[in-house]
Amino acid sequence: QESVMKKVKKIFYSSSACIYPEYNQEDPDNPNCEESSAYPANPDSDYGWEKLFSERLYKAFERNYGLNIRIARFHNIFGPEGTWAGGREKAPAAMCRKAITTEDGGSFEVWGDGKQTRSFLYIDECIEAVRRLMDSDFTEPVNIGSEEMISINNFAQMAIDISGKDITIHNLYGQEVEDKYEHPTPLGVKGRNSDNRLFREKIGWETKQSLEDGMKKTYQWIKKQCEVME
């Protein structure tokens, strides 16, 4: 309402891939995250519902008050300068930190069977995508993410390979998690991958940097943070 009163020219809302229905993400090899698949709505978390309701709120203000809205559904943005410890970090930072802090010949935990799939977009690519979206005249929700899907175990192995260490992955799930941490394993959906066809069609741009290159940059930054903490 304040934006209407102040006559704000353009508004960006950062939504999330978590808005997509759980039933479209049960196949780790072929998840459906096309923008039009958001309805019938059934996000797998309260966070996803909050993001979806907010999208509808912004679109209502667009229809009723003429606000100029841009909505991006982010898919796992990562990179240096982000949270990397304490339990609130995302998977890329967690994998890098574990590979850095685990001794050569040791092992680190990966919750679940590691077969879940995800995609991750480096922060520089995300910023460029947002800039191009804001400069466009496209006003519908659109994915901003990478289409380079990877299993969680392979993602952990990527961090290990970057470290140059001999580290084994210990998949922890089921009763083993409950016995050790006293809560169920939080796995999320089985598969999630950005579908960038709409962005390419309407905005005319696509991501270029590989996941491995982004992980190498993130790894080096987190390594410096760990050295400072020693």
What does each model-found stretch correspond to?
Residues 101-230:
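C-terminal substrate-binding subdomain of Rossmann-fold SDR/epimerase-dehydratase oxidoreductases
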Residues 1-46, 70:
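Conserved Rossmann-fold NAD(P)-dependent oxidoreductase catalytic core, especially the SDR/UDP-sugar
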Residues 50:
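Short strand-loop-helix active-site module centered on a catalytic nucleophile
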Residues 23-31, 46, 56-134, 147-149, ...:
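NAD(P)-dependent short-chain dehydrogenase/reductase
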Residues 1-4, 59, 157, 220:
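Surface-exposed alpha-helical segments enriched in charged/polar residues
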Residues 6-9, 67, 136-139:
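Structured loop/turn residues at beta-strand edges in well-structured enzyme cores
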Residues 35-37, 75-77, 195-198:
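A short small-residue
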